[in-house]
Amino acid sequence: MDNGIAGIDHIIIGVRDLEAARRQWVRLGFTLTPRGRHIGQGTANYCIMFGRDYLELLGFVARDEHAHRLENFLAQREGPMAVAFAPGRDAAATAAELAARGLHPSTPRALGRALELPEGAVTPRFSLLNLPPEETPALDCFICGQLTPKLVRRPDWLSHPNGVVGIKTVHLVADDPAALAPAYRRLFGDDRVAATLNGVEIDTGRNRLIFARPSLSGTDGPPPAITALELRVASRDAASVYLKNAGIAFMGLPDGRLAVSPAEATGTSLLFGE
């Protein structure tokens, strides 16, 4: 039975200074969209668009008494804070498919943001739904349907000097990864959740989630948390040359991936691999 989820739509990265974050990620070799302002809220974002998914740098630009999730996260740290999954068709259809699996999705709700383009503001719109925390344990997530995809995927926003082309894997830490498996089998299906020596690996449809114990994740932060974002590059060698020329501190791992420390990316550990 299809669960109505077609992989990851985007990753939210919470930042304390949105403009400083923009400069930092441009230095890392990413092309950023113009700034978007969430309608009726004190939050704004810059997005890093790929062909099928993206990264969202999210921060405050005004006082917001309702954005408690972001406020609480930033009181502790910066970095990746949530995963948004993509619906296979639309949020309403995904809600029906999840309910048919015995899950408890919320009613889809609307969200819009004013995107500040040189020729004037446009309004990308989205349809969001949530699942109860116990149905996606150790993961802050929701489902985000793109209602106006052409507004946010302009060709010139999809090309990045560092050669990144998409999200490959989200690495997470949890106290007991094996205990998470039943919930994610219910969400994604038995054939898409695998126990590993280090924890649990989940096939979301076009990306992976990997949960590991703190001692195996290499993170100093308390679980549960996203510990690293693994991004796919067109050429690892070209990415290495770009990072060297930009003065970005990174190291090569034994498996060939390139690791950029959180200090270079607003609290986000980045892995670049083919």
Q: How would you name each of these model-derived features?
A:
Residues M1-I8, I13-L32, F50-L111, L115-E274:
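Glyoxalase I/VOC metalloenzyme domain signal
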Residues L32-G40:
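Conserved catalytic-core motifs of GNAT/GCN5-like acyltransferases
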Residues G40-A44, P254-R257:
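Short acidic/glycine-enriched loop/turn segments that link adjacent beta-strands
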Residues C47:
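Histidine-centered divalent-metal-coordination microenvironment in nucleic-acid enzymes
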